[in-house]
């Protein structure tokens, strides 16, 4: 009696298996042409996606580890390393396991995890631009990679929406190497670049947008950090209105006439959701003293600390309870005010906005505070941008490996 299910699929005629005689010959020729330089960093990290709908996460794990991005969290034992289970910053893993992720969700997750991302949808690019991007990443020694979001149907494969990294290019034959992370289904394979380009065109039936390709690099400002945004998109939905509407409306009504008055107003209306917004990495606790010293040298910290130490501190119900349960609350509040979206300050008087703009200016923040705030801003910006898309009606897509 045969077992239930399927054991792999045969590649269509349009694809050439990487391990076949012809596939190996193409590899040797591409290597000699200098078009496999990005392959080796990816090959070191190449793995099979952990779930049938994890093609996006699987591709991203390969690339994040290939770029040597430190997740700042323990994977197993004493090791910091990316696994799919870490990539829940925009959506819960349970949702991704059911539905997969869309192009925009991939971008959000990549940005939240420290990658510099350049997304390119089919209708915003061209065949020649795509070819140039492929040439760029395959000739680079592993500091930039490209992931394609494409329709398998166009390639003559089963299933539909899929993500995979590009591992190489043969310019003379115009073939690209697709490192298919669904290795239980298809092996890595060479396909004609123009055909892969056509596979980016089909419209995602949920987002009503074309698919595309994403360039990913490691941020130059990304050593290990102490603070991380602890929310995924669903949790961020409860926080975003405070930055964009609720607190700005309160500030508009109160019209504080000084920074101290502004901080006091914020602290008296501090949302309980803000108390769990930031996660701290115990693995990097040795950097805490340097970070605290840098925060305490920031003039905004002085005002936050003074407001918390005032006789009115007990009136700040949420913050007062928070202070009794956790150390470094003044430092955490300062970090949130330095890194939060600028919409929070939109209704303040011009002179107060100017003061905050100067104190938040990244180039004036001393190390390691500048790196921490840069990372937090990128994470918050990624979530805020994706929240905006989500609020317009975009939903999770179903990706079938």
Regions found by a protein language model. Name each.
Residues 61-63, 172, 184, 220-222:
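Short loop/turn segments at secondary-structure transitions that flank enzyme active sites
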Residues 200-375:
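Low-complexity, Gly/Ser/Thr/Pro-rich intrinsically disordered linker/tail segments
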Residues 4-92, 239-303:
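Active-site nucleophile-adjacent alpha helix/oxyanion-hole segment immediately C-terminal to the catalytic cysteine
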């Amino acid at each position: 009696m045969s077992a239930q299910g399927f054991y792999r699929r045969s590649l269509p005629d349009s694809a050439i298996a990487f391990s076949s005689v012809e596939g190996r010959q193409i590899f040797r020729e591409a290597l000699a042409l200098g078009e496999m330089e990005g392959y080796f960093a990816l090959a070191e990290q190449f793995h099979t996606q952990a779930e049938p709908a994890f093609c996006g996460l699987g591709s991203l794990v390969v690339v994040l580890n290939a770029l040597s991005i430190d997740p700042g969290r323990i994977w197993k034992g004493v090791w910091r390393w990316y696994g799919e289970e870490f990539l829940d910053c925009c959506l819960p893993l349970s949702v991704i396991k059911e539905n997969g992720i869309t192009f925009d969700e991939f971008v959000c997750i990549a940005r939240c995890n420290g990658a510099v991302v350049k997304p390119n949808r089919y209708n915003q690019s061209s065949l020649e631009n795509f070819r140039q991007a492929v040439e760029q990443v395959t000739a680079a020694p592993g500091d930039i990679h490209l992931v394609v979001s494409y329709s398998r149907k166009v390639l003559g494969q089963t299933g539909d929406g899929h993500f995979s990294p590009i591992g190489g290019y043969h310019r003379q034959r115009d073939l690209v190497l697709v490192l298919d992370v669904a290795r239980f289904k298809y092996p890595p394979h060479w396909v004609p670049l123009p055909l892969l380009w056509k596979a980016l065109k089909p419209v995602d039936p949920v987002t009503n947008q074309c698919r595309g390709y994403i360039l990913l690099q490691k941020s130059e400002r990304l050593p290990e950090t102490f603070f991380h945004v602890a929310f995924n998109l669903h949790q961020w939905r409860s926080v975003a209105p405070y930055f964009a509407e609720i607190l700005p409306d309160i500030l508009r009504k109160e019209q504080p006439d000084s920074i101290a008055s502004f901080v006091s107003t914020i602290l008296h209306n501090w949302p309980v959701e803000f108390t769990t917004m930031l996660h701290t990495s115990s693995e990097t606790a040795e950097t805490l003293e340097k970070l605290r010293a840098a925060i305490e040298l920031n003039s905004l910290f002085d005002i936050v600390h003074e407001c918390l130490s005032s006789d009115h501190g007990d009136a700040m119900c949420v913050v007062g309870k928070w202070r009794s349960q956790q150390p470094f609350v003044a430092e955490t509040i300062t970090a949130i005010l330095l890194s939060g979206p600028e919409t929070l300050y939109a209704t303040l008087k011009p002179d107060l906005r100017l003061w905050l703009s100067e104190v938040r200016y990244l180039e004036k923040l001393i190390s390691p505070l500048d790196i921490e705030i840069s990372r937090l801003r990128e994470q918050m910006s990624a979530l805020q941008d994706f929240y905006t898309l989500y609020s317009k009606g975009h939903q999770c897509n179903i990706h079938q490996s």
